[in-house]
């Protein structure tokens, strides 16, 4: 396994002979160090000969701006990899929680990708997402809602998101998931081929196995969560290798 390296604001894992590319955006503050938070998932994908680019960011209120920043960082990173490989890899975009929203708001509307995997799509208001915001924000005179807000986000997806191939994954015990809202918006588009998959787990399942392994070591691993991560790696890996639609 190659080592993580920093490129263009992203954490990158490049197998010796990459056969595909994963462009990953994590959720909320987990995405500050995705190479740690999502270690098990991302390294599992790299083991399938998929290059992994994970954008590192601190979440803010302007999600439209951050969607553009993430898209630009991942595009720049992809250019470095393609020059190195002397071939063009078309990515599968993978998002977790807020990361799904940022991918869906990308300036190219998903056109320059093979597919997208959306894990635990989350589209709550800022007040719902950030405890006490509604109480303290007025006194501080700060912005109290994400841009775009929840309803506008779904409208933009329905109107401007052009990628037909999407794998929307919901974890059964996830109290923050809004995948059904996403599926409804996607299904209203002409030619939509999105698929919905339910798995065991909760909102932190994509990240928790990596966190436990990184902080406590393999002895603290949770076999049930590891099995779910294995299923995620298989499903996303098949997308990345172009096997899902064969």
Residue ranges of predicted features:
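Gly/Ala-rich beta-loop-alpha elbow adjacent to hydrolase catalytic centers
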Residues: 91-103
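The feature captures the conserved acid-bearing segment of alpha/beta-hydrolase catalytic domains
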Residues: 13-16, 115, 125-195
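Short, surface-exposed "cap/lid" segments of acyl-processing enzymes
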Residues: 3-59
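Short glycine-enriched nucleophile-adjacent loop
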Residues: 100-111, 116
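Alpha/beta-hydrolase active-site loop
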Residues: 61-88
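Residue in the alpha/beta-hydrolase core beta-strand immediately N-terminal to the catalytic nucleophile
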Residues: 91-92, 115-117
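Catalytic histidine neighborhood in serine/cysteine hydrolases
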Residues: 189-215
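Catalytic active-site module of serine/aspartate enzymes centered on a nucleophile-bearing elbow/loop
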Residues: 208-246
């Amino acid at each position: 396994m190659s080592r993580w390296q920093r490129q263009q604001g992203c954490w990158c894992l490049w197998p010796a002979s990459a056969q595909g590319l994963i462009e990953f955006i994590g959720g909320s503050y987990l995405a500050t160090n995705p190479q740690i938070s999502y270690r098990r998932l991302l390294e599992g994908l790299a083991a399938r000969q998929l290059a992994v680019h994970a954008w590192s960011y601190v979440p803010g209120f302007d999600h439209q701006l951050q969607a553009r920043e993430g898209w630009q960082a991942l595009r720049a990173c992809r250019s470095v990899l393609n020059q190195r490989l002397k071939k063009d890899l078309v990515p599968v975009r993978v998002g977790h929680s807020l990361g799904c929203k940022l991918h869906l708001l990308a300036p190219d509307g998903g056109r320059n990708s093979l597919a997208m995997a959306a894990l635990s799509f989350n589209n709550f208001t800022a007040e719902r997402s950030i405890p006490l915001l509604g109480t303290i924000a007025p006194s501080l005179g700060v912005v109290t809602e994400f841009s775009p807000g929840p309803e506008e986000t779904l409208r933009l997806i329905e109107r401007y998101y052009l990628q037909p191939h999407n794998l929307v994954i919901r974890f059964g015990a996830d109290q923050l998931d809004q995948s059904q809202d996403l599926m409804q918006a996607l299904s209203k588009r002409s030619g939509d081929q999105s698929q919905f998959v339910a798995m065991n787990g909760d909102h932190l399942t994509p990240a928790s196995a990596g966190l436990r392994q990184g902080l406590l070591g393999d002895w603290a691993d949770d076999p049930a969560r590891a099995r779910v991560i294995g299923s995620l790696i298989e499903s996303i890996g098949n997308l990345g290798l172009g096997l899902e639609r064969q």
